[in-house]
Amino acid sequence: FWNYIMKRCFLVVIDSLGVGEAPDAKEYGDIGTNTLSNVAKYVGGVDLPNFNNLGFGKITNVEGLGEKHSGTVGRLSELSIGNDSTTGHWELAGLITEKEFQTFPNGFPSELINKIELEANCKFIGNVHASGTEIIENLGEQHLTTKELILYTSGHSVFQIAAHEDICNLKELYKICEVARKYCDDYNIGRVIARPFKGSIGDFKRTYDRKDFGMNPPG
């Protein structure tokens, strides 16, 4: 086995598909989490022969999957501080995060917002911790009227900008996010996320053109 030369590998990342709580779960309110197992239980079991062959049933208890497999299976926990996507992706590439990305449960500081608004020639409304679908329903009408972009965050280190495609096209939205990314580095914010949506009042829908602007890894 060890004499075999691996010419290439396929690294598949299924973001947020957890297989059980990590040792630091209590620090993030994640006690008892197990996305894969809980989803399988909710739907009454899953039929995933390829996942089963890879060994997913060996990693955690998944209704519908067995322990028989043909692959080499392992289950790892992060050494990094943090539980967001960027931290995990960096560690997959060998970079350990020793300083957790900054979160802003009470909104972002005005000096950061002012810098972005000035350079990007835009205005923001919102600046709250919120669900993405709920905030476009709550502020969507105001956004359509004023053309001010919707700014919000979550429990992770994210600076999210939502805009209706008729108010701010993708090219403009991405450009604004690039400006935001530059200033968010100074605040140790992991990701700036473009959140375009479409539709009418009472029937807004986020599109598939989301784009994440991550902090460049150090080193």
For the regions a protein language model found, what residue spans apply to each?
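Generic enzyme active-site microenvironment
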Residues: V13
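Extreme N-terminal starter segment of soluble prokaryotic enzymes
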Residues: M6-F10
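Short, Lys/Arg-enriched N-terminal segments with co-localized hydrophobic residues
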Residues: F1-I5
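Active-site nucleophile/metal-coordination loop of metallo-enzymes that catalyze phosphate/sulfate
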Residues: S16-H164
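Active-site pocket-lining segments that scaffold enzyme catalytic pockets across diverse folds
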Residues: T133-P218
